[in-house]
């Protein structure tokens, strides 16, 4: 799959009203500027309100008598689709084809920028379960896909823009069934193109929401994330130029891809305008996300959005202010730095595409029940990146991937994971794997046998303390204290009471590392999250794995991935996840040397930038 580079598009002259206020000249100029600056893919939106303007007609006692089109027009076709809108959309596709732009079409665009755009016939209805709503959705899909499926500019069909914002759902079964129904309706009329999710804010498991990663993966061919630091949960604590913000999109996208076992596209991202950061940082933010997601195997990155919307006088632009200044182009049409930088990095990625194998992974991070799954995943990923450990994610209910190292960070509550998977995990430890567990008021069966520790007392207590490990002190916090003594475990660190807080226990051919505090969960709501040195705990606990890498660094902002081909040749990608230039001072394993530099500078990695180079084996 080609790495998708582009943006989300509404016309500069009209925004969400572009199909009603169609201006071919404005659209053509928009696309010309975008295409010459590296935009190869665009996500576009046939406004549902405009393309299927079906309205109800009532008679005596407000009884429904028939449906027609807005303005009391007779329907032009069985799908109640406005053929004028279809003609405009087809012309739009023609222009995109002229400029070499491929389209992801968000079919059921009933939600956009804080406003619902649905046909009046469906007002007040449950769009996921109501028979009338489902009927008109099926008709709309049939009408759109059959009329446009022959156009070469269309790359994929998207269920619609963030359709999980169209109303509440009673259960995950409702959400998943709706997504499968819509996706299969699309495939019924066009099975030659991928179906893209278009959703955001999905949950790893049912206990954190009805719209789940697994549900979308069951329905769609390509999953999507919309990782905005301003909007996403727990992502707005630090500056745009911070490591916490920088890893967000890569982490979330990898979480969805790993749990869903489907390609995942960063379908929308951006810095949300000049009140959050300046234009130079926005450009650097896009550069970083293109490079980082490319080397981590994402399906692509798309900016929100193409154009400024400060001159638009229609809702939602007149009702809220955050959507107005997000474009890659200014109001006068000139490119912002984010657009020109997108074009530059697009050229770099196209030169590397097909030459860089998948990144190697060191460990599996298992997310468990009852915890704040996204927050824990996010913080674990950040600590691991700083330490030099590359992780993938797994959900505790699913089949656990084979691995040499497992992490169960910040377990919470008493339902942690199904017993059958727990026993499989213990068996893998006995066969030689390493298991790391940190505790956030969680209960583990067979705790003593697993950890070599015995709990003597436990109590709820808001505790902030200091632990000592290898002569270095670290702050910790926890809400429940399990007081333990070793019954076979080696104590690596003690708390300020002198009690074991990090330990290691040999179990069969493997080992269990236990942290008696929620290292990861404690960081979720903390500002300047990764400016302190907690990552050194990971670096110490997993040092055998990390030090076995051909390339390492002590520079915490630098995340390294290694990419090995079938012949054993290695490419190293090093990304700087901060807005300060960093000297990585790479440590190269014996027998290797830095070879051809494919991108960047090995001596200094600029702000939100990277370096990619080959390793050569010494004779």
Where are the regions that the model predicts?
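Alpha-helical scaffolding within the catalytic cores
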Residues: 26-30, 139-145, 202-215, 246-256, ...
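Carbohydrate-binding surfaces of carbohydrate-active enzymes
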Residues: 258-262, 270-619
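Structural recognition of the beta-strand scaffold that forms the well-ordered cores
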Residues: 4-8, 41-45, 103-106, 155-159, ...
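Active-site mouth of glycoside hydrolases
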Residues: 1-215, 220, 284
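Conserved, mostly hydrophobic/aromatic
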Residues: 7, 34, 96, 144, ...
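Glycoside hydrolase catalytic-domain groove-lining segments
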Residues: 173-177, 192-199, 203-274, 308, ...
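Short, flexible/disordered intra-domain loops and linkers
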Residues: 57-63, 168-173, 205-208, 232-244, ...
